[in-house]
Amino acid sequence: MCVVTYKESNTKVTGLADIGKASSFALADGSVPVGKYTRQALVNAGMLEGAEDVSIITADEVSKALGGVEINECANVGVVTSAVAEGSNEVGTVYYSDTYGLEDRLEILEKIPYDLTGDVIYPVAQIQNSEADELEASTAKEFVDFLITDDAKEIFQKYYFDTDVED
């Protein structure tokens, strides 16, 4: 994950630690992964009081903890990305991969370390399907097998996915 702003925003924010300096902060809802990761990062950084389930921490609680910054609570990471890229919000937290193709519109202020967010993973597994024929089952296995190859790793890295994770 990363803290982003729009190009030429002249923000005083340098990253998560001073995100409260922003005039507005696009924050994904706590019910979606990027919203949970952001809240967890703020808790782990000592900027926000924790909860057993960080997804229940409200936007108002985040705003108060950050000194009253205006929060635009967004439905998902795509909405956060758009809100910042178009300049509707000064900063936001998004996945690094969501900045791909927007290099001319977004500036990455900080990549948030995993020790604050926890591991950001996209798991994959092949499931059993009694209705799948042999071709469908073997194709699914081939796809999963491909996803763990060096060729797939190169593709993921091209689109800003971090592949330096443990199995």
Named regions from a protein language model:
Residues 2-167:
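Exported/periplasmic ABC-transporter solute-binding proteins
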